[in-house]
Design a protein with these regions (language model features):
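Eukaryotic intrinsically disordered, low-complexity regulatory linkers and tails enriched in Ser/Thr/Pro
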Residues: 1-63
Length: 63
């Protein structure tokens, strides 16, 4: 399991298991949604979709 550190929109440090992310999407205004399979299992971060995707892909490749 490879954890990726993000800061959520509330300024809290959040660690995400890159293997468990179902999808990411642009939420507007530089915010990105990371979804893990349900409405309650969603994290919003102040990063572009490209930056989030890069961090998650890097974690997946660096196994």
């Amino acid at each position: 399991m490879k954890l990726v550190r993000f800061e959520d929109i509330h300024g809290n440090e959040t660690f995400v298991n890159a293997e468990r992310v179902n999808f990411i999407s642009d939420f507007g205004s530089g915010k990105t949604e990371l979804n893990f399979g349900g409405k309650e299992a969603t994290v919003y971060v102040e990063m572009s979709v490209a930056a989030v995707a890069k961090a998650l892909l890097k974690a997946a490749v660096d196994k």
